[in-house]
From Swiss-Prot:
GO function terms (MF aspect): RNA binding
One Pfam family in the UniProt entry: PUF_NOP9
Main location: nucleus
Record protein name field: Nucleolar protein 9
Lineage, uppermost ranks: Eukaryota, Fungi, Dikarya, Ascomycota, Pezizomycotina
Species: Leptosphaeria maculans (strain JN3 / isolate v23.1.3 / race Av1-4-5-6-7-8) (Blackleg fungus)
Residue stretches of biased makeup (Polar residues): 640-658
Length: 712
């Protein structure tokens, strides 16, 4: 296994600063004893890589990493001050910051490589890249040109390369959409040659091309290579799995002012045809020189596996699933047998991945992206009769989840029958992710969930029937006031997600959770609100379209007298925010909550989360102009008059449409009673008016006169 990826920068005070040359040497080592013991074929795989074998048959690795020198003390102090100024963000205007940034880059002129390799200053360069203009990004590209092979393998410089590729990606799309951007701008340097961002990326790829096989399993370069592949493909950068693009331990580097205009991260980008051609060439070169045996060894390599996943996904999504028939394709090299049957190399490969902590992730990618014909063959041969046993396993359960996402209705019903029998065992082992996926797919395919409901009701049953606190794993220590919010266990998070998924299903399955929540004591309800995972379940319950008015009324009333206290808690404050939407059709409850918030104004204003609740509930308007607050809150609820209990003063049907999908029997009875009472009152008023209009005796003239006056 590779060494632990420590956080970098001056914040890691426990480590002494080392020379960059030592870091470079460390970056090239992979705990050779551990890795080679498990993945012996890798060196041979690298030797077989195109361009990776010399004439004498020895492995051609990248040369010695170049040492670019170190910043002197004054330079380090300067960039430390730059980092502090970025944190303070005390610029009067964006123009002032742009001018300051220009001066910083002027000071850094000629020192870019030293900064990128510096333990204390590389983070500063990474933050500066996030604020850079396209011209400044191109300048950094040009300074790094010819040195990328060294930089991507460096512990600190590799982060700068990642940031540079990500920030430069939209510039390629902008230049493609607006060719006038490619016109050579006036330059003070007559020898300056204008280069498009497209060509800068292609130059970088050409520099790395010869050593791609080695970089795929390099501790730091593998992450940069994946980012570069995603940029070339035009795929959304934020939708990629974090484990595929970067290490889980990677420090999140950000800077104020870089948040705006980053919507492109979640969007598919238009890229030039040269990028797609380069991507196809990379995929071909990465596998063309490797025998299938050596290529498969990457599937269980901790660094090679994510790169292999990405290459496989990009191949099938960008070049058509018909590519699987091409003998030179990556998917065909991994699974060459047709048909795939027991006893073949492909079968041995698949069976070896199912229970492997690393290899199973590649199998998930194959299942998710394989052509329909190939998926059906794999499912029928290896998994159709094993869904129950797969779901019980901690690792294979995730493979089973991916399989469920691709099954049709008939196959899903058969798989459900196998998994439902295992639900008691799954609940006992806290492996609820597969149950959540099964419910979601049953809803999507229109499969009846009655058997799932029965098993869950039994598995989480107690003295009072189904107990939601068992599914949420709530202990006596959780949610206590003044307690610290510790990192939550995966079991609690998965339990909360399962409860939320159940509530998204209309009918008996969702009602299990709703009824259990409504029957909790006020103390337990407050405890749930304070517990982070359980709090999200409460939020979902209060805002669910399947939650009835009666449930929301009962649930919210559990918090009476505790609203001010809960609004100060980081988790419970979000429940108070959710009550705003949860009181649609419940005017008196919304105003009751607002009154409690107003009573605790002082403490709320002194707390960060309290101020957020105060703002979300528009309490400033409530304090100044309460009538306006009432009108606006009624308008946002979509009902001119909120539904009160037990009678309705407004449009009950509209309230019910927004608050819940269906009215219960008692709600229908109340609506009918209110309508009958209103009709009776109307008849009574009409009779009285008729009597007054046709008055008798000495009062007839007076009554008639009064009627005429009113009519006027």
């Amino acid at each position: 296994m590779p060494k632990e990826h420590k956080k970098r920068g001056r914040r890691d005070e426990q480590k002494k600063r080392k020379r960059d040359a030592d870091d470079d040497a460390t970056a090239k080592r992979h705990k050779k004893d551990d890795v080679d013991a498990q993945f012996q074929p890798l060196d041979a795989a690298h030797q077989l890589h195109h361009g990776g074998v010399g004439e004498d048959g020895e492995l051609t690795r990248p040369g010695e990493v170049q040492f670019y020198g170190m910043l002197d003390e004054d330079e380090q102090e300067f960039f430390k001050n730059v980092d502090d100024q970025l944190d303070r963000n005390e610029f009067a205007s964006p123009d002032e910051r742009a001018q300051w940034l220009k001066n910083v880059f002027k000071e850094a002129e000629g020192k870019e490589l030293k900064i990128a390799n510096s333990q204390s200053c590389s983070r500063v360069l990474e933050r500066l890249i996030l604020l850079s203009t396209p011209g400044q990004l191109k300048n950094i590209f040009e300074k790094f040109n010819g040195h990328f092979l060294n930089l991507v393998q460096h512990r600190f410089a590799s982060h700068c390369c990642e940031a540079l590729f990500l920030q430069a990606a939209p510039v390629v799309t902008q230049e493609l959409a607006n060719p006038e951007r490619l016109q050579t701008p006036p330059s003070s340097n007559p020898d300056h040659i204008f280069v498009s961002m497209e060509n800068l990326f292609l130059f970088t790829l050409a520099e790395l091309q010869e050593h791609l096989g080695f970089l795929m399993t390099d501790r730091f370069a593998s992450h940069v290579l994946r980012v570069l592949l995603v940029v070339l493909s035009g795929s959304p950068l934020e939708r990629q799995s974090k484990s595929v693009l970067q290490s889980k331990r990677k420090e999140k580097v950000d800077v104020t002012g870089a948040e705006k205009g980053r919507e492109w991260l979640a969007e598919k980008r238009a890229v030039p045809q040269s990028f797609l051609e380069a991507l196809e060439k990379v995929i071909n070169n990465c596998v063309s020189g490797m025998e299938p045996h050596y290529l498969r060894s990457l599937a269980t390599h901790p660094l090679g596996n994510p790169t292999l996943q990405l290459l496989l996904k990009l191949e099938l999504s960008h070049f058509g699933k018909s590519r699987a028939k091409d003998e030179k394709s990556l998917i065909h090299r991994l699974l060459p047998d047709d048909p795939i049957a027991e006893g073949t190399d492909s079968a041995a490969f698949i069976n070896g991945l199912v229970y492997d902590p690393i290899g199973s992730r590649l199998l998930e990618t194959i299942i998710e992206n394989a052509p329909g014909k190939l998926f059906k063959a794999i499912y029928g041969e290896f998994f159709k009769e094993r869904m129950g046993s797969l779901s019980r396993n901690e690792i294979a359960g995730y493979v089973a989840g991916k399989i469920l996402e691709r099954l049709g209705k008939d196959d899903l019903e058969e798989a459900m029958r196998q998994i439902v029998d295992q639900i008691p065992s799954l609940v006992e082992r806290n492996r609820t992710a597969i149950i959540k996926t099964l419910i979601e797919r049953c809803v999507a395919r229109g499969v009846d969930t009655a058997s799932i409901k029965a098993q869950l009701e039994t598995a989480y049953g107690g003295s009072n029937g189904f107990e939601v606190i068992r599914i949420l794993k709530l202990s006596e220590e959780d949610g206590k006031p003044g307690g610290e919010h510790k990192q939550q266990s995966p079991e609690k998070l998965h339990g909360s997600l399962l409860a939320q998924t159940m509530m998204s299903v209309e009918g008996p399955l969702g009602n299990l959770v709703f009824d259990s929540l409504a029957n909790l004591s006020p103390e337990l309800s407050v405890q749930l609100a304070r517990d982070p995972p359980a709090s999200r379940t409460l939020q979902a319950a209060l805002t669910s379209p399947n939650a009835s008015v009666i449930f929301r009324r009962k649930m919210i009333q559990q918090f009476y007298g505790k609203v001010g206290e809960l609004a100060l808690d980081p988790s419970a404050s979000r429940v108070i925010d959710a009550i705003w939407n949860g009181t649609a059709g419940l005017a008196f409850i919304r105003e009751r909550i607002a009154e409690e918030l107003a009573e605790n104004e002082g403490s709320l204003r002194e707390s960060y989360v309290g101020r957020a609740v105060w703002r979300n509930w528009r309490m400033d308007l409530y304090k100044r102009k309460r009538n306006d607050w009432v009108k606006q809150s009624r308008y946002t609820a979509g009902n001119d008059g909120f539904q009160s209990f037990p009678e309705s003063d407004g449009d009950a049907s509209n309230s019910q449409t927004r608050a819940g999908k269906h009215m219960t029997a008692i709600e229908l009875a109340r609506q009918k009673h209110a309508a009958a009472k209103a009709a009776a009152q109307g008849k009574k008023d009409m009779k009285k008016e008729k009597t007054e209009r046709h008055g008798t005796g000495s009062n007839s003239s007076a009554v008639g006169t009064k009627g005429r006056v009113v009519a006027q």
